[in-house]
Amino acid sequence: MKVVYTDDALRDLLDIADWLADHYPAVAPAVERRIRRLVARIARWPLVARRVVDRPDIRVAPLGHYPYKIFYRVRDDRIEILHIHHAARQPRTPEN
C-alpha cells in the first residue's frame, strides 16, 4: 500500500534527526533504519498495530527498543503517517 507522510510527520522526522545528530550521532543511522523498516511493515500489514483508544481511526506502532511511536491512519488507497513521537512526549492531536 502507498505511504504518504503528513507535513507534521516530516517535521517530526527532521526534529528526531537533528536531536539525535546533536546528542547521539552514533545511534542516528540505526534509528533511521528502524523507522524505515517499521513503515515498510506498516505498508505490508496496515491493520496489525493497535488503535488509539480515543481515536479509533488512528493506529500506533512502537519502534521496538527505541523510544518512538509512529501514529498513522489507513485510508482506502494509502497509509498516512501522521506523527512520529518520542514515547515520553504527549502526542499532538492529528487533524482530520
Predicted regions, residues:
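Enriched for short, Lys/Arg-rich terminal
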Residues: L63-K69, R73-N96
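Basic, Lys/Arg-enriched alpha-helical interface segments
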Residues: K2-V60, R75-R78, P94-N96
